[in-house]
Amino acid sequence: MPKSSEQNNESVVKSILERSSYRNVESCKRDILAALHHYRGLQPRQQKYVFNDGRSRDLICLEGTIPVPYKGQSYNIPVSIFVLDTHPTHAPICYVRPTSEMRKYYFLPYVFIFNVFKPKN
């Protein structure tokens, strides 16, 4: 990654951490910058996260793509990774953000078994 991009990421992360209520700022900054250096398709931004109980917080979100090797190929998978304000005590919350072009295949064992053993009329 070019130096200017790394410096920009560092200033964005530092700015978000200064405006937020992260408990362990240095650990967060170090781990986030390491992730951004390793996965160059990610970008830091501040984003509101709504928890299951309805509470919301402004968190650092790493958005973009990460390369995932599968059967000899590398696929860039779009993700959103929310770094909690309690990091490193609690793990980040990660989401895969499929694009409209991604093929979706769902395997539901109950439906499969039902169709295989369905009585024939």
Question: Locations of the language-model features?
Answer:
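Strand-helix-loop interaction patch of compact alpha/beta domains
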Residues: 2, 6-75
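Compact alpha/beta protein-protein interaction domains typified by the UBC
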Residues: 56-117
